[in-house]
Every structure is written in C-alpha cells, then in structure tokens.
C-alpha cells in the first residue's frame, strides 16, 4: 500500500525534474543557435532561483557586484555592434516560468550600467527580459568624449537595439514567442521609455516610465544652475543640510494641511507657494539654529523658481517644494552637479578641462542648440503610439530631488495642446500619476511602494503594482484609476504603516475622513 500511495508523487516529481532538465538542456545548447547579425555571444548559463549571481564584469561605479535571482532562468550575455566604432553590452534573461511577455528595462543617470535588479525583478515576474549598458561602461560621461556614436547609443539606439535583438531571441528560445511587449524604466529609463514612444511607436504595447528625464538638455542645465544660486559651501548664499531642514519644516508647516490632513505629506505641490520670509532670523538673534539669513532666503526663493533662458523663455519648471532634505546633498551641496559637469565637458564643449563653476545661462543656450540625436525627448505629438494601440503609464514622485515632477506635468500639458486632447481622451492611452511622498524613483516620506522595482515592491497584484497594472490595462482593457502606494516602516520588506491611492492627473488627493489619514478610503480624488 505504501508503494502504491507514493507512485503519483514519484510520477509528479519525475515530470517536474524532466521539465527542469529539459529547460536546462535548452539553455545549455541555446548559445550555438544564436546567429544574428552584429551579435556576439559571450556566454549562456542556467541560473537556478535563489542564486546570488556574481557580476565580476560590472563596472565598479555601477555599485552592484552581485544580484540575487529569485527564479530559474537562462542568462544570455552578449555584445551587439551598433556601428563600426560602437557596441552595447546586452543581457537577456529567460525565466522557466514564462508568461508570454517580453520586456525591456532601462538605465539611470548618464550611466552605462545594466540594471541587474530590474532584470531580476521582471524575470521573477515571468517576463523574458533584456537590459543593456547604454553603449558604455560606468556612471561617468567620459566615454562620450569625441565619440558621437556612443552619444547616439545613449540617446536612443541602445534601447531600440536591445529590443530588436531581444525579441528575436525570445522567439528563438520559446516556441510560443511572445504575446505582448513591455517597458519598465525610471529617470533616464523614463526618458528612454518616452523616446521609444516618440521614435519607435511599435516597439512596446505598454510603457511604464517613471520620473522621466525628458527635456533632457534643459534638465542638465537646470541641475547645474543650482550651483550659481547656492554658491560654494563658503558662500553666504549657501545653506547647510541643517538649514535646509529648517526650510523644509517650514514648507511642510505651511503646505501640509492644504489637502485636509496633517500627515507630513504634501499631496499637491501645485498648491504649495511657501513664504520663506517667515523664517528669516530676527535682528540681533543669538540663536540662529531655527532661522536663516536674508541671503539664504533669496537662495530658497530662487531654487523654488522656474529656470528661464537668455531670452526669457522657460527652459525648465521649478523644483517642487517638499524635496529639500533629499536635494540638499545632491544639487544644493555647494558643488556643480556631476552629471551636468560631465555632459558639458564631454558632449557640449569636448573639453575635459571645462570649469563647471563658471557656468552661465548662455551655456544653456549652447547646449540646447546642440541637442545631439534629439536627446531632448520632448516631442509632444505621440499620435503614432496612440494609433499603434500603445499604452503609457507614467508616475513621478513629488519629493523628487533630481528631476522636478513639475516637468512631467509640463509635458502632459504639451501633449494635450499638441494633440488637441483633454484628460478624458488622453486617459485612453496616456495616464500620469503624481506620487506624493516619493523621492527619485524610490524612497521618500510617504507611500512610495508602487511596485516599479524591487525597492518598492508590495505584491504583484495589479492594484499594488504599477507594472502589473500596465499588464492588466494592455491585456484586459482595465485601465488603472489609481496606483496604490505603500508606506513602509523601514524600507521594502518591513511592515506597511499605511497605503494610499495616488490619483491620476489632473485629479488630486483630498482628505475627507472620517477615518485617520492612514486609511486610504478617507481620501478622495477630486
């Protein structure tokens, strides 16, 4: 009797093992089958779920020497020529538990870093996933120097090349090919998503583009212009991180309860117009720990003002209030912003010795006139993507310290004006969700856990996961009315203090009660 009762289990175990062995065998032989133009396979390997994958070839500046992989998958590493003098490093990760979906990841900053955490995240969700190094290695802009082909890879070609090759490989690896194609990226990755929408409208069925770095050239100039406002850390116009906390606390005091709840979160930064004069130190004050000087107050006012060009034209909107604590260490730190310095040195002026401390708004005009390969990514007519049936879901943290969320609002307005469509019509294919309490792509003081990556994960249900919400929109026609964010007690994996439904633009969240502010149903999108 015992042997008979074990037979079904043994049969099932054998079937599972055979399936596993077949997948490993397919992976082991796959490299020999890849004979695509300009594609040079470095290696193909089977990676079991639970492996802490070492990444010895990842540039040290990318900050990732290993990556935990949650799902069994076949890893394909290759180089792909993009011209006679340039190539991208590309990886494709094919999960054993495949859902029939293809996905491309993006990049960040000026970096030439494959975002292995996004590969692991999306492969773990069953996507056949690709990621590339943007045509160079490391986070510096130095590879752009006198190398326009590398700039072209960075502007658009790396992502598109990876998509073309990745789709071919997916069809080769899985006999069923793929049903739908998706994109997931934030920051530079958000810009890359919109570049695909604008230039290659048939590449993706669904694009999730967070905190997009479009209006790119002006973003570069906006980021460096803060130094001309704050000066160095010895200037009387400079604010220390401690002084920025004083400013931040006052801004929150003035603007927190505009939404109806005192929770430390500004729900709609458009309604926040802080009066900074309230914290100028009184004449003769002996204790200046909770106030700032008049010169510093002027710095704050200028930092929170739009950025205009030499002819008075708007180049970039203001930094949204509420991001002061996060921004104090990166763009208000008394040094020219590093990515901007690199862009001007190695792209705009081709001069590694260019002095970033001498930057003026005239330099912004030079950079914008150059706009190599239309890296601005600012085209407002996305009708080709609309006609192709594509969907785009974009989000932007309203505590973003690197890319103002006001810029995403500006692009939304430009698309509406260019295409002659109001919010109801745009909702059919383009939905934008400002996320209160979210910093740059992740982190922040509020409910930032929206599932755009491993660092914001709070479940794979569409209502809790911005990527899976896009899948549901594309495959079932159910468009997201909101995206739910989780407020973690101590980062991803810790307890969830509360959740909040972030409204789709141009709606905004208002506290109505009767429950506590931590009750998501006590809020209403108006």
UniProtKB/Swiss-Prot annotation:
Main location: secreted
Pfam families: Tannase
SUPFAM superfamilies: alpha/beta-Hydrolases
Keywords assigned by UniProt, alphabetized: Calcium, Carbohydrate metabolism, Disulfide bond, Glycoprotein, Hydrolase, Metal-binding, Polysaccharide degradation, Secreted, Serine esterase, Signal, Xylan degradation
EC annotation from Swiss-Prot or TrEMBL: 3.1.1.73
Disulfide-bond pairs as recorded: 27-74, 62-113, 186-441, 255-272, 281-291, 503-525
A single MF term (Gene Ontology): carboxylic ester hydrolase activity
Family: Belongs to the tannase family.
Protein name: Probable feruloyl esterase B-2
């Amino acid at each position: 009797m015992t042997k008979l009762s074990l037979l079904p289990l043994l049969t099932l175990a054998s079937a599972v093992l055979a399936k596993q062995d077949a997948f490993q065998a397919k992976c082991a032989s796959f490299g020999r089958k890849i004979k695509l133009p300009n594609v040079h396979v470095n290696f193909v390997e089977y990676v079991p779920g639970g492996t802490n994958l070492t990444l010895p070839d990842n540039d040290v500046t990318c900050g990732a020497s290993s990556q935990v992989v949650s799902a069994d998958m076949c890893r394909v590493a290759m180089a792909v020529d993009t011209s006679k003098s340039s190539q991208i490093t590309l990886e494709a990760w094919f999960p054993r538990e495949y859902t029939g979906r293809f996905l491309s990841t993006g990049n960040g900053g000026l970096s030439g870093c494959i975002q292995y955490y996004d590969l692991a995240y999306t492969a773990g969700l069953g996507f056949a996933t690709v990621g590339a190094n943007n045509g160079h290695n490391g986070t510096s802009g130095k590879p752009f120097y006198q190398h326009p082909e590398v700039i072209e890879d960075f502007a658009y070609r790396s992502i598109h090349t990876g998509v073309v090759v990745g789709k071919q490989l997916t069809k080769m690896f899985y006999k069923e090919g793929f049903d739908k194609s998706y994109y997931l990226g934030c920051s530079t990755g958000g810009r890359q998503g919109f570049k695909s929408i604008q230039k290659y409208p048939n590449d993706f069925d669904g694009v999730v583009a967070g905190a997009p770095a479009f209006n790119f050239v002006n973003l570069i100039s906006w980021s460096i212009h803060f130094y001309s406002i704050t000066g160095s850390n010895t200037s009387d116009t400079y604010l220390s991180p401690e002084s920025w906390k004083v400013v931040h606390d006052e801004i929150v005091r003035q603007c927190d309860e505009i939404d109806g709840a005192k929770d430390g979160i500004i729900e709609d930064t458009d309604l926040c117009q802080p009066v900074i004069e309230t914290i100028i130190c009184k004449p003769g004050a002996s204790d200046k720990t909770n106030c700032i000087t008049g010169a510093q107050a002027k710095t704050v006012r200028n930092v929170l003002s739009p950025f205009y060009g030499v002819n008075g034209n708007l180049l970039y909107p203001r930094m949204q209030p509420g991001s002061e604590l996060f921004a104090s260490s990166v763009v208000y730190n008394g040094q020219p912003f590093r990515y901007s310095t690199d862009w001007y040195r190695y792209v705009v002026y081709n001069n590694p010795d260019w002095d970033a401390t001498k930057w003026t708004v005239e330099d912004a005009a030079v950079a914008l006139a150059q706009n190599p390969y239309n890296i601005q990514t600012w085209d407002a007519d996305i009708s080709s993507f609309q006609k192709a049936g594509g969907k785009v879901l974009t989000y932007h943290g309203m505590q973003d310290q690197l890319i103002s969320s006001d810029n995403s609002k500006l692009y939304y307005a430009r698309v509406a004006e260019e295409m002659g469509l109001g919010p109801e019509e745009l909702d059919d294919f383009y939905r934008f969700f400002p996320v209160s309490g979210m910093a740059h792509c992740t982190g922040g003081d509020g409910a930032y856990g929206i599932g755009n990556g491993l660092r914001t994960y709070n479940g794979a249900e569409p209502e809790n996961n911005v990527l899976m919400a896009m899948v549901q929109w594309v495959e079932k026609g159910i468009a997201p009315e909101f995206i739910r964010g989780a407020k973690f007690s101590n980062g991803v994996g810790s307890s969830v203090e509360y959740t909040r439904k972030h409204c789709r633009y141009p709606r905004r969240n208002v506290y109505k009660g009767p429950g506590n502010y931590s009750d998501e149903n006590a809020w209403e999108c108006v």
